[in-house]
Amino acid sequence: MSAFSEAINSLFSGHYADPFSLLGMHHSSKGLEVRALLPDADAAWVVDASNGRKIVELERVDGRGFFCGLVPNRKHDFHYQLAVTWREETWVIEDPYRFGPLLQDMDIWLLAEGTHLRPYERLGAHLETLDGVEGTRFAVWAPNAQRVSVVGQFNFWDGRRHPMRLRKENGIWELFLPDVKAGQLYKYEMIDSHGSVRLKADPYAFEAQMRPDTASLITPLPEKVPTNEARREANSLRSPISIYEVHLGSWRRHTDNNFWLSYQELANQLIDYVQYMGFTHVELMPINEHPFDGSWGYQPLGLYAPTRRFGTASDFRAFVDALHGAGINVLLDWVPGHFPGDEYGLAQFDGTALYEYSDPREGYHQDWNTLIYNYGRHEVRNYLAGNALFWMERYGIDGLRVDAVASMIYRDYSRSEGEWVPNHYGGKENLEAIAFLRYTNHTLGHAAPAAITLAEESTDYPGVTLPPDCNGLGFHYKWNMGWMHDTLTYMQLDPVHRKHHHDLLTFGMLYAYSENFVLPLSHDEVVHGKRSLLDRMPGDVWQKFANLRAYYGFMWAYPGKKLLFMGCEFAQGREWNHDASLDWHLLDEPEGWHRGVQALVRDLNHYYRQQPSLYQLDFQPQGFEWLVVDDRENSVFAFIRRDEQGNEVLVVSNFTPVPRYGYRIGINQPGGWREVMNTDSVHYNGSDQGNVGTIYSEEWGSHQRQHSLVLTIPPLATLYLVKEA
C-alpha cells in the first residue's frame, strides 16, 4: 500500500493528525492539485469562486469519499469552492482546508505562557468572516490528543469530516468552518493519548445545552459592557454595601408547575423586590453551566456559559443590564477551586490530567468528589483568570465572590496525614494556587478596576485583602467566617447562659481591622441540618423572632459590609430547599411575625444607606468605639459608630428577655439624643418598649465618660440613637 493510500485510510479512520498537509490546494510535482475529504459524496468539482464556473471534476480515488485532481492552466492559488453531489443533490461549499493558520504568533506565545489577557477571544468558537467567507473559527487546547475534530449539527456529528490543524507550538487545534452559524450545536471529538475516542464539550463555549444534554452552542462573544463611576463607587470600602444572596432557581417559582422563573421573569420580579428591600448588591449563586442541580452551581463545567436553565446567554445579559439600570450592583459566586469529573467535561481532557493535578493527593477533592485545577500549569491559570475578566468585561459583573479559597491555598485541606503532598519547601500551602489568586486579582485590578473580588476564606491566612505587592492575595473583601460562627453560637444559647459566653460578641473586634470584612449570613448557614436562622434562635415564638430582630440590628451596626441569604430577610422557618420556592406565603398575614422581620430588614437597609456613620469607616478603628463591653450579667452591649465628620450613632443591644429600665450609658457627646431604630418596635411586631422623644444627657460620669444617658432597653432588642442637631 502506498503512503498516499495509508494517509487516506488514516483520514477515514480518524487517525490522521495533520489534515492540512493532505487536504486543500497543494503544489505538487504534477501541478496545482486539490484534494477533498467528502464522505459518502458521489461527485465533486472545483469551482472558481470569482465567477461560479466549474473548472475540473475531481476523481473519486477512494469509494468512501476522497477526491483529488489537477487544476488545468493554473499555477497560483486562487479562491475556489467545491460543487459536491450527495444523492443527486449538488451543493456548492467552501473548503475549510483552503484557509491558512488562524492563531497569530503573539497569541500562540501568550497562550503558551499563560498570560493572554483575553484567551476567550482566541479559544472556543467564534463567528468570523475570513477571505469574504462567513463561518465559525474553532480552537481548543488538547496537546496530547492524536487527532481532534469539530463535530456538530452541521456535519452529522461525524468526526471524519472536519479534523483540525494542530499548532505544535502550544498544543492548540484550530479550524475555520465556512457557513457554520450561530445557534448550532457542536463538540470536539478527539482520539486521546491512549487511542480512545472522546467527545468533549468546549471549555470556552459561551453557551451550552441545558442538562441532561451536554453539547456546546455557537454563540457570538458578547460585546463589552461599559463601566460607570456610580457602579464603581458602590463597590468602594467607604460605601454602604448590603448584599442579597440569591439562588435563581429557588428564589421564586411558578406556582402551577414549580418550574423556574426565566431571566426575564426574574428581571421583572426580583429587581423590584431588591429595590423595595433596600439592598445595594445582588450576589448570584453560580450561574455557570453545571450538570447537577443539587450542586447549586458549585460544580460548574461551563465556566464561560450562563446556565440555560433560565434562558439564553443574551437573556442573562439583559437581566444584568436591568439590575444595573435599577442601580443594583451584581456579584457572582465564582468557583475556580474544583470541577466535576463528568466524561464530557475537563476531566482527562485529552487522555491526560490536563486541567487537573495528576496525583489524586493533589488533584482529587474527597469532600465533593471533584477534581482540583492544576494551578501550576500556565494554560489552566490563563483559562481561569481569563474567565474572571470575561464576566466583568462581557457581562458587566461588578464583582466575584471566590468560593472555598481555603481549599485552594492549603494542600492539607480536609486531608489526613499521608493524604497530601507538601510543597517544594515542605509546607502545606499550595504556592501555585496562591500565585494564581495573586495573578488574577492583580490582572483584574488593571483590566477591570471598577470591579471587586471577595474571598470566602475560612482560616486565618494573613493578608487576604492586602495587595499582591504587599504579599497579600489581593482581594478587596473577605467573608468574616469567624464573626458569623461566634455570633450565631452566641445567639443559639439560652439567654440565661449568654453571660458565660459574653466574649463571643466582643472577640471579633480584636481582629476586625486585620482584613476588609463582609459579615455573611449565607446559604451555608441554612442547610445540611443547621436549621434556619429563625429556628436556631432559643425560646418561644415571641423570643425567637425578637432574638433574630435584635441580632439583625446588631449586625447592621457592626463594622463590615453585610450579606444576607434570600429568605432570611423574612425569617423563613424551614431550611432552604433548592428544589422549591421560598415560603412567600409566610408574608400573607399583613401584621404577622414574618412581615415584621421583613419590615425591619428593609428599614435597616434604608437607614444604613443614608447614615455614613454605619459604613464610612468600616475598616478604620476611629469608626468604632465600645461604650459598654463588660456587662456580662445583663448581656448588654453598647458601642458608637462614627463617620469622618465625627457624627455618631449609639448602638445598644440587650440579649436577654428582661427589659432594662434606667440603664445608664456613658457618652462622648452631651446633649439631646433621639431613638431612630428599635427592633422591638410595634412596627416589627415587638413589645414596643423604648425611648420616646428626646433623651437629654446628664452630667453624671459613667463608663469612663463625664456625661451619660439613661435609657430603657427593651427585651431582646437593639436600639440606634443619634444626637439631635
Swiss-Prot record:
Name of the gene this protein is made from: glgB
Keywords annotated in UniProt: Carbohydrate metabolism, Glycogen biosynthesis, Glycogen metabolism, Glycosyltransferase, Transferase
GO molecular function: 1,4-alpha-glucan branching enzyme activity; cation binding; hydrolase activity, hydrolyzing O-glycosyl compounds
GO cellular component: cytosol
EC number(s) reported in the record: 2.4.1.18
Source organism per UniProt: Pectobacterium atrosepticum (strain SCRI 1043 / ATCC BAA-672)
Subunit structure: Monomer.
HAMAP family: GlgB
SMART domains per the UniProt record, alphabetical: Aamy (SM00642)
Recorded family membership: Belongs to the glycosyl hydrolase 13 family. GlgB subfamily.
Active site annotation, chain numbering: D403, E456
Function: Catalyzes the formation of the alpha-1,6-glucosidic linkages in glycogen by scission of a 1,4-alpha-linked oligosaccharide from growing alpha-1,4-glucan chains and the subsequent attachment of the oligosaccharide to the alpha-1,6 position.
Name of the featured protein: 1,4-alpha-glucan branching enzyme GlgB
One GO biological process term: glycogen biosynthetic process
PANTHER family noted in UniProt: 1,4-ALPHA-GLUCAN-BRANCHING ENZYME
Entries under InterPro entries matching the protein: A-amylase/branching_C (IPR006048), Branching_enzy (IPR037439), GlgB (IPR006407), GlgB_N (IPR054169), GlgB_N_E_set_prok (IPR044143), Glyco_hydro_13_cat_dom (IPR006047), Glyco_hydro_13_N (IPR004193), Glyco_hydro_b (IPR013780)
Reaction equation(s) it catalyzes: Transfers a segment of a (1->4)-alpha-D-glucan chain to a primary hydroxy group in a similar glucan chain
UniProt superkingdom: Bacteria
Pathway entry: Glycan biosynthesis; glycogen biosynthesis
One Pfam family, short name: CBM_48
